Amino acid sequence: TSAGVEWATNNNHNRAKALSDLTGANLAPTVGLFTLVSQVDKHAIILGVDPINTAGTARTGQIDPMLIAFSDQDNIVEWEPKSTNTAGALSLSEGSTIVGAVKSRQEILVWTDTSLYSMQFIGPPFTFGINLINKETGLIGPNAAIVTSKGVFWMAVDNFYVYTGTVQKVPCTVLSYVFDDINVSEVY
């Protein structure tokens, strides 16, 4: 998988260009699982990203499935965390891989295979805060969550859930029909 891209328009041809190939790119991720933009505070965010090496000179090229990296505010080419910018990274602890994320009202909800996290912009010096919302309610696949006016709904490996500030199981008359015939070894 590739990391984030920018769409370049040239002679009526649209093409994607890797962030790491952009002029001035500094430690931009080279691989990642998911990319999104936190539009209110204007940060590019890549989930399941390759970390910066121990020397701090390059990306490793190997996905850390529990690492989230974010660019400097309103600057998609600057990914090196410095005291003079808002770039940085967060590591999740519950689960083995990030499965998906959605932008909600005041937060970005991030699911691992086992848990749900809330990621919120808090400003410098930490930029984003991450809070574990619930264990044992992971996401079954990258497209198994949706934001609605009634809350955020998703499918886990054992149930349907809704988040409205707290996590609740969704009453469902077809629950056994769906989950009694699912091969959990083939989930994301």
Where do the language-model regions lie?
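Beta-sheet-dominated scaffold domains
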Residues: 1, 51, 92-188
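Disordered, low-complexity "stalk" and linker segments at domain junctions of extracellular
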Residues: 1-42, 50
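Beta-strand initiation motifs
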Residues: 5-19, 75-84, 124-130, 168-171
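Alpha-helix initiation/capping motif
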Residues: 9, 29-30, 71, 171-175
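Generic N-terminal initiation segments characterized by hydrophobic and/or small/turn-forming residues
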Residues: 16-19, 24, 60-67, 71-73, ...
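A short beta-strand motif characteristic of beta-propeller blades
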Residues: 17-26, 83-92, 129-135
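Carboxylate/His-rich catalytic cores and anion/metal-binding grooves
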Residues: 32-80
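A structural signal for short, well-ordered beta-strand segments and their strand-loop junctions
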Residues: 44-46, 75-86, 90-91, 110-111, ...
